[in-house]
Structures are given as structure tokens and as C-alpha cells.
A protein has these predicted regions:
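Aromatic "clamp/platform" in nucleotide-sugar-dependent glycosyltransferases that forms part
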Residues: 43-44
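Short alpha-helical segment that forms part of, or immediately flanks, the ligand-binding pocket
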Residues: 29, 51-56, 70-71
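Short hydrophobic beta-strand element within catalytic cores of glycosyltransferases
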Residues: 60-63
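Short alpha-helical donor nucleotide-sugar binding micro-motif in glycosyltransferases
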Residues: 22-23, 30-35
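Nucleotide-activated donor-binding/catalytic signature segment of Leloir-type glycosyltransferases, i.e.
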Residues: 3-22
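A charged, aromatic-enriched C-terminal amphipathic alpha-helix characteristic of glycosyltransferases
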Residues: 98-131
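A short hydrophobic beta-strand element within the catalytic core of glycosyltransferases
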Residues: 39-40
Length: 133
């Protein structure tokens, strides 16, 4: 954490960066919903609930192509997901924030429990219908 804080100071962005440390879910969501983007720079963690939570509150994602979520982030334009992102990608998310936020708000239903149950029931209906033929 200290190394990142020093880097933020060196880059002159410290006033615009918040290092929160560990937070409860209730503490996180209000901050996440006001954020320009959720930045996830991972090389191995491939299934992150924080990405789903960010999309659910309309916060665009900037991540590597490692998380499983990266596929639908790219497909539905919920943010940037690529091997190496940089300042131009961050500028893109900020400059086009309305589009990314709107896309997140439209997509979040697909991540809901209700949608997952409906998908399961549809698959089961199709299976039963195929058995009748």
C-alpha cells in the first residue's frame, strides 16, 4: 500500500486517489457507485465478485483479460478488458463514461439471481420439451 501511495504522490495524482484498505460490503458500495471506474490489474485471480458488484451499481471496469468476466466486459462494452491497459484506456472510460455506465445499467439484470433462475428454468423447459418429442 505504501509503495502505491508513494507512486500516487510522485505522479501528482494523490489528491484524486483513495486507498481504502479492507472494507465491508456496506462501506464499499456507496464509494463504488460514485467511482469513475473499477481498476483491476490481475494476472491470476480469474473470478471476481467485485467486478459484478461494480457493474451492478453502474461503474465501468478496467481490467486485464485474465478474469472470466473480461469476455462479457468486452462483448457488452462495460469497460476495458485487455492484456495491458494504459492511460489512454483510462481516458476512454472517463470520456465515454455515459455510454459505459448506461451499458452497465442495462447489463446488470443479466447478473441477477432472478435472471439466473429464469435461465435455468428455460433450459429445464427445453429439456422437458425435447423429451416429449
Amino acid at each position: 500500500k505504501e509503495k502505491l501511495q508513494r507512486m500516487a504522490q510522485t505522479l501528482g495524482i494523490a489528491p484524486n486517489v483513495i486507498f481504502t484498505g479492507k472494507m465491508t460490503h456496506d462501506e464499499l458500495l456507496p464509494i463504488l457507485s460514485k467511482s469513475k471506474a473499477l481498476l483491476v490489474n490481475t494476472v491470476k485471480d480469474n473470478n471476481m465478485i467485485s467486478i459484478v458488484e461494480a457493474i451492478a451499481v453502474g461503474t465501468p471496469i478496467v481490467t486485464t483479460d485474465v478474469p472470466l468476466n473480461s469476455t462479457y466486459i468486452k462483448d457488452y462494452q462495460l469497460g476495458i478488458a485487455k492484456k495491458q491497459w494504459d492511460e489512454s484506456d483510462l481516458n476512454d472510460v472517463v470520456s465515454n463514461s455515459e455510454m459505459y455506465i448506461e451499458n452497465c445499467m442495462k447489463y446488470r439484470y443479466k447478473l441477477s439471481t432472478k435472471q439466473r433462475v429464469e435461465q435455468f428454468l428455460e433450459i429445464e423447459r427445453e429439456r422437458l420439451d425435447d423429451g416429449k418429442k
